Amino acid sequence: MLTAKQNMIECMKPGGQPDRYVNQYEAIKLLFHPFMFSSPAPQKGQLNVVNAWGVTNSFPDNVPGAFPVHTPDKIVVKDIEHWKDYVKAPSLDFPQEAWDQCKAMYDAVDGEKAFKAPFIAPGLFEQTHHLCEMVNALYYYVDYEDEMHDMIKYLTEWELKLAEGICDHLHPDMIFHHDDWGSHDSTFLSPSMFEDYFLDSYKQIYGYYKDHGVKYVVHHSDSYAATLVPDMIEMGIDVFQGCMKTNNVPELIKKYGDKISFMGVIENAFVDHEGWTDEECEKVVRETVADCGMHSFIPD
């Protein structure tokens, strides 16, 4: 019987022979890096916590996660034409003790059974709308192209320095990188605009990781992003995690399954609602695995 890690590798590789469905995150151990400890984040019930980028986040009791607060007084970028006056990248110079603390977590994982994957968030697109506010950011992508290109370059350089520290000190064999690129039914940017702003930056970031020991890139975007799959492949993404059913994953597997795998489809709306039943959950899971199969697909 294959280990969870071996089975996931067989699922992902062309012509692989997995001996069972990949069991969600069984083969992926999400781990920390020092920046996660140095940037304040709200715990459930906490409001208006300012992180290392100056973004204010809240985590009310009645929601599943924290989110940026964008009342006018809390938006970081007050004037996009002078964004450099507002956006100040936090330091990534950490003492060796901080790296050692994280390395102990990596060393505790059995690398034969699971991937060691640092969790990296937010991604480039998310960071722009965290700093600017979502509607503002989308407007700036259309009317302030030079400023947004420059901001993304600045964020990319910071991410590359983060990648350098992670690879030099922690030596992961996988990364789990977060950047939501769409809603339930559409991407936030057209494919051509997305490529113009993000393709080269992510090729640099994911290319750096793969040039320094990382074998697999899992990119999280719990959204529709089917039209961006060719770009994901070019960026070096191995798993599109969080893909909604609206992506028509069986068709994506037929078209791209020899180049990228897909993790998702079982949406919360189908199985996590008031009055849910075991029978209903089982029905959704069985239908999903029947539609998508065992190769290039991880039910989640």
Describe each region flagged by the PLM:
Residues 1-28, 50, 88-300:
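Active-site loop segments of alpha/beta catalytic cores
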Residues 16-58:
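N-terminal accessory/capping or targeting/presequence segment of soluble
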Residues 34-38, 61-65, 69-72, 130, ...:
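Short aromatic-enriched loop/helix-cap "lid" or pocket-rim segments at secondary-structure transitions
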Residues 47-98, 108-117:
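A contiguous, low-structure linker/loop signature
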